[in-house]
């Protein structure tokens, strides 16, 4: 084993990756590399080197991340209904709720392109009844937005990163990605919505503003994490 591999393995096993300068982390480590983990809650592709990511680590440890949210949802989700998962992250909750009752369809929304690709793979490998939306849920539909990409080299919890809109309209930038917004009220739902979860790190109010008609019509329970 050469000195390069010795140094690399040291930083991985000791979980000291975050101490390296960002440029070195990006160059030396393939931090976007995914690994398939077979767990008691399903099979999930997760970032292999995101060693400080709480959601990732809970899933790998055969746990349900935010188990109380899942347990609360199960009480309200009914057969033959739709569940809205706004801010689906890696998709564990979407996968589990799609299977908790008969004929449940989950509508999962995720804004980050990188996280969305992981979400899509996890839905597919678990054969879950989930409809995917790569959109920023808010109070407008089809509004073209530019947001800052997640700095995945920091190895923190992806779900704790706030969506940051930017006036820099350059999708070729290494730090910017383009995305279309969507409002819940503009989506056609062919059957009853029995539950809605919102976890979008500071964008919750915009989601609710764009869901007013749906909420008044459906009267579904909603659970969300509000941040000022």
What are these regions (language model features)?
Residues 1-228:
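Phosphate/nucleotide-binding beta-alpha loop and adjacent structural elements of enzyme active sites
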């Amino acid at each position: 084993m050469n000195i390069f591999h010795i140094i690399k393995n040291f930083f991985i096993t000791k979980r000291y990756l975050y101490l390296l300068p960002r440029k070195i982390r990006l160059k030396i480590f393939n931090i976007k590399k995914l690994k398939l983990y077979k767990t008691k809650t399903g099979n999930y592709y997760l970032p292999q080197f995101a060693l400080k990511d709480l959601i990732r680590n809970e899933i790998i440890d055969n746990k349900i991340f935010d188990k109380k949210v899942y347990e609360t949802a199960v009480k309200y989700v009914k057969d033959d209904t739709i569940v809205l998962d706004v801010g689906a992250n890696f998709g564990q909750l979407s996968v589990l709720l799609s299977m908790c009752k008969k004929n449940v369809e989950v509508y999962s929304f995720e804004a980050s392109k990188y996280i969305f690709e992981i979400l899509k793979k996890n839905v597919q490998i678990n054969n879950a009844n989930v409809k995917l939306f790569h959109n920023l849920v808010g109070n407008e539909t089809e509004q073209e937005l530019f947001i800052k990409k997640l700095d995945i080299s920091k190895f923190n919890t992806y779900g704790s990163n706030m969506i940051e809109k930017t006036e820099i309209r350059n999708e070729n930038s290494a730090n910017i990605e383009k995305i279309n917004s969507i409002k819940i009220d503009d989506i056609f739902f062919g059957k009853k919505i029995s539950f809605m979860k919102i976890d979008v790190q500071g964008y919750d109010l915009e989601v609710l503003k764009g869901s007013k008609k749906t909420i008044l019509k459906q009267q579904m329970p909603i659970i969300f994490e509000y941040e000022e």
